[in-house]
Swiss-Prot record:
InterPro entries: Aldolase_TIM (IPR013785), His_biosynth (IPR006062), HisF (IPR004651), IGPS_HisA/HisF (IPR050064), RibuloseP-bd_barrel (IPR011060). This is Imidazole glycerol phosphate synthase subunit HisF. It comes from the Bacteria. The active site is at D11, D130. Keywords: Amino-acid biosynthesis, Cytoplasm, Histidine biosynthesis, Lyase. HAMAP family: HisF (MF_01013). The gene is hisF. One of its GO terms (biological process) is L-histidine biosynthetic process. It is found in: Cytoplasm. Heterodimer of HisH and HisF. It comes from Idiomarina loihiensis (strain ATCC BAA-735 / DSM 15497 / L2-TR). Pathway: Amino-acid biosynthesis; L-histidine biosynthesis; L-histidine from 5-phospho-alpha-D-ribose 1-diphosphate: step 5/9. Belongs to the HisA/HisF family. One of its GO terms (cellular component) is cytoplasm. It catalyses: 5-[(5-phospho-1-deoxy-D-ribulos-1-ylimino)methylamino]-1-(5-phospho-beta-D-ribosyl)imidazole-4-carboxamide + L-glutamine = D-erythro-1-(imidazol-4-yl)glycerol 3-phosphate + 5-amino-1-(5-phospho-beta-D-ribosyl)imidazole-4-carboxamide + L-glutamate + H(+).
Length: 265
C-alpha cells in the first residue's frame, strides 16, 4: 500500500511566504528558504509552492527562489504559478522542481494540459482546482485567479465536470483546494472530497481546512485521499508533522516514517 503524504503548502507573494483565510487577507509568514528547510527536515513527504499572484499578474514563478530551494532541500517539491507554456514548465523542472502544477492557465487553455503531459509525462503534471461551494445554487464551482482578490472570479466550470475534463486530458494528480474551508481550521471538506474521490482515477490531494491532527486522519480514512496539504497549522506551529504521522500510524494509515525520510539526507 502506498504511503499517504503530508504536504506543507507555502503560498508565495513578492518573494515571501504568506497565508490568508478563504483566499483573502494574506499575512506575511516569513522567508521561503528557512520554512522550506524546516519542513523538509521535520518529516514532510513533499512541499508545494504556490506563487499566488503570478497567473493574475501575467507572469511566471520567480526562478531565483526555485533554484535556491532545490539546492537546499532533498524532498520532492511542486511549483505553481503562471506556468502557461512548455518553456515555462521546462524552466521550473530544470531548476529542480519535481512537479509543476497549473490552475488558472489550464482554465484559460485546457489544451495546455495535453501539451505538458506529452512533453514531460503524466507523473509530473498536477492540476490545482479552486472549488467554491455556492450555497444558493448548491453547486461546487471552479474559480480562477484566486490569488488576487481584485481578479478572482467564477469560471464556467462546475468542479466535478472540470475534474473529469482534466483527467481525460492526462493530469497526473489533482489538488482540490476547498475555498470555503481555506484557513479556517475547521476540517477538510470531507463531503466534497468523498464525492469526487469516485470520479478521480489519479491521486487526489486534499487542501483547505486542517486545524487539528484528527482532521488529517479523517481526510485519509473518510475521503480516501492520497495526500493532505496544510499551511497555517504548520506555519503557526500548532502541531508538528511528526505528531500528524504518529496519529496516522496509530490509525493504521500507511505512512512513510520520518526516520526513512531522514536516511535519504
Amino acid at each position: 500500500m502506498l504511503a499517504k503524504r503530508v504536504i506543507p503548502c507555502l503560498d508565495v507573494r513578492d518573494g515571501q511566504v504568506v497565508k490568508g483565510v478563504k483566499f483573502r487577507n494574506h499575512e506575511i509568514i516569513g522567508d521561503i528558504l528557512p520554512l522550506a528547510k524546516r519542513y523538509a527536515e521535520s518529516g514532510a513527504d513533499e512541499l508545494v509552492f504556490y506563487d499566488i499572484t503570478a497567473s493574475a499578474d501575467g507572469r511566471t514563478v520567480d526562478k531565483s527562489w526555485v533554484e535556491r530551494v532545490a539546492r537546499e532541500i532533498n524532498i520532492p517539491f511542486t511549483v505553481a504559478g503562471g506556468i502557461r507554456s512548455v518553456e515555462h514548465a521546462q524552466t521550473m523542472l530544470s531548476m529542480g522542481a519535481d512537479k509543476i502544477s497549473i490552475n488558472s492557465p489550464a482554465l484559460l487553455n485546457p489544451n495546455l494540459i495535453n501539451t505538458l503531459v506529452e512533453e514531460f509525462g503524466q507523473q509530473c503534471i498536477v492540476i490545482g482546482i479552486d472549488s467554491f461551494y455556492n450555497e444558493q445554487s448548491g453547486e461546487y464551482e471552479v474559480h480562477q485567479f484566486t490569488g488576487d482578490e481584485s481578479k478572482s472570479h467564477k469560471s464556467a466550470w462546475q468542479t466535478k465536470d472540470w475534474l473529469q475534463e482534466v483527467i481525460s486530458r492526462g493530469a497526473g494528480e489533482i489538488v482540490l483546494n476547498c475555498m470555503n474551508q481555506d484557513g479556517v481550521r475547521q476540517g477538510y471538506d470531507i463531503a466534497q472530497l468523498s464525492a469526487l474521490r469516485g470520479h478521480c482515477s489519479v491521486p487526489l490531494i486534499a487542501s483547505g481546512g486542517a486545524g487539528e491532527i484528527q482532521h488529517f486522519v479523517d481526510a485519509f480514512q473518510k475521503a480516501q485521499v492520497d495526500g493532505a496539504l496544510a499551511a497555517s497549522v504548520f506555519h503557526k506551529n500548532l502541531f508538528s508533522i511528526s505528531e500528524v504521522k504518529a496519529a496516522m500510524a496509530a490509525n493504521n494509515i500507511a505512512v512513510r516514517p520520518i526516520e526513512a525520510l531522514q536516511e535519504t539526507t
